[in-house]
Amino acid sequence: TVIGHRSTRIPSTVNNPQSSTVLDRAAFYKAMESESKTLVDAQISELNSAPADVKNAFLGAMIMRKAGIGGNPASKLKLFKQGRALLEGAIAKDPENAEFRFLRLIIQENAPGVLGYKNNITKDREFIQKSFSSLPEDLQKTIADYNKKSKVLKLQVS
């Protein structure tokens, strides 16, 4: 279930809140949970016009989500690789961004094993657990809600 967030400012790094942009986090996470290609495509369109400081992580995650919805195996793999390159590039540029690491954890937990994209789960889980209390409240709520159905996150939150 998606939380009813309003549009919020998402810092590009936890330590540098001056570098931020507006993204409709509620719509983004709703599309991430959805099986609707229409919702996912709408988010991809929105993200394509977002500023570069957050665009690649969110766009990469959404493209990987699209890969999981449908199509032939070759096109799904191509989309997944394209999204992975964007997300991993964003994390490499901003490794202290807990939300980027959360996006990767969501994808890695739910990606088919055959893709071999599971190697950062422990590291990301530990980083998210360590950073959780300093994150914006609406992001904490999003993560806590995901934690309820996650088999790997294991946050101790009420």
Predicted regions and their residues:
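Residue-level recognition of tetratricopeptide repeat
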Residues: A52-D53, N97, L135
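TPR/TPR-like (Sel1-like) alpha-helical repeat modules
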Residues: K78-A85, L115-S134
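TPR alpha-solenoid repeat register
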Residues: K55-N56, F100
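Short coil/turn linking the two alpha-helices of tandem helical-hairpin repeats
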Residues: A31-E33, R65-A74, N110-L115
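Helix-turn-helix repeat elements of alpha-solenoid scaffolds
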Residues: K30-I44, S75-R84, Y117-K118
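Terminal, low-structured helical/coil segments at or just beyond the last alpha-helical repeat
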Residues: T122-S158
